[in-house]
């Protein structure tokens, strides 16, 4: 994993335009490494058949990373056995969404980040830019590969919180805001679960072994006390693990 920028709340995520509440003239964050340095790293990996995962949060960093992935694809073709991934990618340029699909780049998000800083996106980025943050439903409509995670220890390592926030766009503790933040980007439970399981396995390049229950796969699974696909989303966090299996072997039972 490579880091290409910081975070919006500290004005270290790299933007194409300055922050709405600039701390100094031209405040638009910065890349953590020069773009040419990242380009050399990604191209060297692509030449050897390897893929790269890059931390990008601001639209400037996302756009620059996609430019590099695009050049790598032109030179060496799209990766065949693993998948380039952008991690977090919170604030995108609208035109870069379709580039994710074109380049088969995984959009790896942490749903609990949505409400980590209430009011922060509007404060730092303004209403227009904040309307295209964590666009899970749009990704699904456009055919973008998605992966979900917790980003522990930044947020708790609690799987049901991930699913709850992806489905409701509400904070897992306060349940704010009513109706969800950007409710048009809510997704159904089946999509959220798929992103969290098979999507994450795909991002890791191990979807042939992990992420779903199919003949020949590892049979890593949990048994829950209620069905996350049918339970009321507001009751989802009460779900308890009854058993855990690793490679088909029982390793935990309540």
Spans of features found by a protein language model:
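Active-site-adjacent helix-turn-beta-strand microarchitecture at beta-sheet edges
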Residues: 1-46, 51, 97
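Glycine-centered flexibility motif
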Residues: 6-9, 25-29, 58, 126, ...
